Amino acid sequence: MANIKSQIKRIRTNERRRLRNQSVKSSLRTAIRGFREAVDAGDKDKASELLHATSRKLDKAASKGVIHPNQAANKKSALALALNKL
Protein backbone atom coordinates (compact mmCIF):
# COMPACT_ATOMS: atom_id res chain seq x y z
CA MET A 1 0.00 0.00 0.00
CA ALA A 2 1.23 3.46 -0.89
CA ASN A 3 2.17 5.98 1.77
CA ILE A 4 1.79 9.12 -0.34
CA LYS A 5 -1.64 10.74 -0.18
CA SER A 6 -1.87 11.45 -3.91
CA GLN A 7 -0.88 7.89 -4.75
CA ILE A 8 -3.58 6.52 -2.44
CA LYS A 9 -6.10 8.64 -4.35
CA ARG A 10 -4.70 7.45 -7.68
CA ILE A 11 -5.12 3.83 -6.60
CA ARG A 12 -8.78 4.51 -5.83
CA THR A 13 -9.44 6.32 -9.11
CA ASN A 14 -7.58 3.67 -11.10
CA GLU A 15 -9.77 0.98 -9.57
CA ARG A 16 -12.95 2.92 -10.38
CA ARG A 17 -11.80 3.43 -13.97
CA ARG A 18 -10.76 -0.20 -14.32
CA LEU A 19 -14.24 -1.31 -13.29
CA ARG A 20 -15.89 1.19 -15.63
CA ASN A 21 -13.67 0.13 -18.54
CA GLN A 22 -14.38 -3.52 -17.82
CA SER A 23 -18.13 -2.87 -17.84
CA VAL A 24 -18.06 -0.82 -21.04
CA LYS A 25 -15.89 -3.36 -22.88
CA SER A 26 -18.21 -6.15 -21.79
CA SER A 27 -21.26 -4.31 -23.12
CA LEU A 28 -19.40 -3.65 -26.38
CA ARG A 29 -18.62 -7.34 -26.80
CA THR A 30 -22.27 -8.19 -26.11
CA ALA A 31 -23.51 -5.64 -28.66
CA ILE A 32 -21.08 -6.86 -31.32
CA ARG A 33 -22.05 -10.48 -30.63
CA GLY A 34 -25.74 -9.62 -31.04
CA PHE A 35 -25.04 -7.86 -34.33
CA ARG A 36 -23.01 -10.81 -35.66
CA GLU A 37 -25.80 -13.23 -34.69
CA ALA A 38 -28.32 -11.11 -36.61
CA VAL A 39 -26.01 -11.07 -39.64
CA ASP A 40 -25.50 -14.84 -39.44
CA ALA A 41 -29.28 -15.31 -39.28
CA GLY A 42 -29.66 -13.12 -42.37
CA ASP A 43 -31.98 -10.63 -40.65
CA LYS A 44 -31.02 -7.41 -42.42
CA ASP A 45 -33.51 -5.11 -40.65
CA LYS A 46 -32.49 -6.22 -37.17
CA ALA A 47 -28.81 -6.14 -38.12
CA SER A 48 -29.20 -2.59 -39.40
CA GLU A 49 -30.75 -1.45 -36.10
CA LEU A 50 -28.06 -3.25 -34.11
CA LEU A 51 -25.33 -1.70 -36.27
CA HIS A 52 -26.59 1.76 -35.37
CA ALA A 53 -26.71 0.94 -31.66
CA THR A 54 -23.32 -0.76 -31.70
CA SER A 55 -21.68 2.11 -33.60
CA ARG A 56 -23.05 4.52 -31.03
CA LYS A 57 -21.61 2.44 -28.18
CA LEU A 58 -18.24 2.23 -29.93
CA ASP A 59 -18.14 6.00 -30.46
CA LYS A 60 -19.08 6.65 -26.85
CA ALA A 61 -16.40 4.26 -25.59
CA ALA A 62 -13.82 5.95 -27.81
CA SER A 63 -14.81 9.43 -26.62
CA LYS A 64 -14.56 8.34 -22.97
CA GLY A 65 -11.10 6.90 -23.56
CA VAL A 66 -12.07 3.28 -22.94
CA ILE A 67 -10.88 2.22 -26.39
CA HIS A 68 -8.70 3.98 -28.96
CA PRO A 69 -10.61 5.98 -31.60
CA ASN A 70 -8.91 4.02 -34.40
CA GLN A 71 -10.05 0.75 -32.85
CA ALA A 72 -13.63 2.04 -32.79
CA ALA A 73 -13.34 3.10 -36.44
CA ASN A 74 -11.92 -0.27 -37.48
CA LYS A 75 -14.66 -2.19 -35.68
CA LYS A 76 -17.41 0.03 -37.14
CA SER A 77 -15.96 -0.44 -40.61
CA ALA A 78 -15.83 -4.23 -40.24
CA LEU A 79 -19.40 -4.35 -38.93
CA ALA A 80 -20.69 -2.16 -41.78
CA LEU A 81 -18.90 -4.39 -44.28
CA ALA A 82 -20.54 -7.47 -42.76
CA LEU A 83 -23.96 -5.81 -43.06
CA ASN A 84 -23.36 -4.78 -46.67
CA LYS A 85 -22.48 -8.37 -47.61
CA LEU A 86 -26.03 -9.46 -46.73
UniProtKB/Swiss-Prot annotation:
The keyword RNA-binding applies. Residues 1-22 are annotated as: Disordered. Transmembrane segments: none annotated. One of its GO terms (molecular function) is small ribosomal subunit rRNA binding. One of its GO terms (cellular component) is cytosol. Keywords: Ribonucleoprotein, Ribosomal protein, RNA-binding, rRNA-binding. Residues 7-20 have a biased composition (Basic residues). It comes from the Bacteria. InterPro entries: Ribosomal_bS20, Ribosomal_bS20_sf. GO terms for biological process: translation. Gene3D superfamilies: Ribosomal protein S20. The keyword Transferase does not apply. Belongs to the bacterial ribosomal protein bS20 family. NCBIfam families: S20. HAMAP family: Ribosomal_bS20. Binds directly to 16S ribosomal RNA. This is Small ribosomal subunit protein bS20. It comes from Mycolicibacterium smegmatis (strain ATCC 700084 / mc(2)155) (Mycobacterium smegmatis).
